[in-house]
């Protein structure tokens, strides 16, 4: 195996998971903060806000999992080797 390709694959995998987690992390923080603000304004809408928040957090977390899958594919099923 070419050491340059191996090193580039590891760096690419690190970037894939690192950059793939930044956006969802920021989005989850923003969504959680806005949900808390909504609960503070309308406590009677707790169930609806919580359900919507959990669903949106699951979709955001899926993006991070896609980054993990890409990183694992780059490391273990490298098409360049």
Swiss-Prot record:
GO terms for cellular component: chloroplast thylakoid membrane; proton-transporting ATP synthase complex; proton-transporting two-sector ATPase complex, proton-transporting domain. It is a multi-pass membrane protein. It is found in: Plastid, Chloroplast thylakoid membrane. Keywords: ATP synthesis, CF(0), Chloroplast, Hydrogen ion transport, Ion transport, Lipid-binding, Membrane, Plastid, Thylakoid, Transmembrane, Transmembrane helix, Transport. Its main location: plastid. Pfam families: ATP-synt_C. The keyword Chloroplast applies. The record marks 61 as: Reversibly protonated during proton transport. The chain crosses the membrane at residues 3-23, 57-77. In plastids the F-type ATPase is also known as CF(1)CF(0). F-type ATPases have 2 components, F(1) - the catalytic core - and F(0) - the membrane proton channel. F(1) has five subunits: alpha(3), beta(3), gamma(1), delta(1), epsilon(1). F(0) has four main subunits: a(1), b(1), b'(1) and c(10-14). The alpha and beta chains form an alternating ring which encloses part of the gamma chain. F(1) is attached to F(0) by a central stalk formed by the gamma and epsilon chains, while a peripheral stalk is formed by the delta, b and b' chains. Belongs to the ATPase C chain family. This is ATP synthase subunit c, chloroplastic.
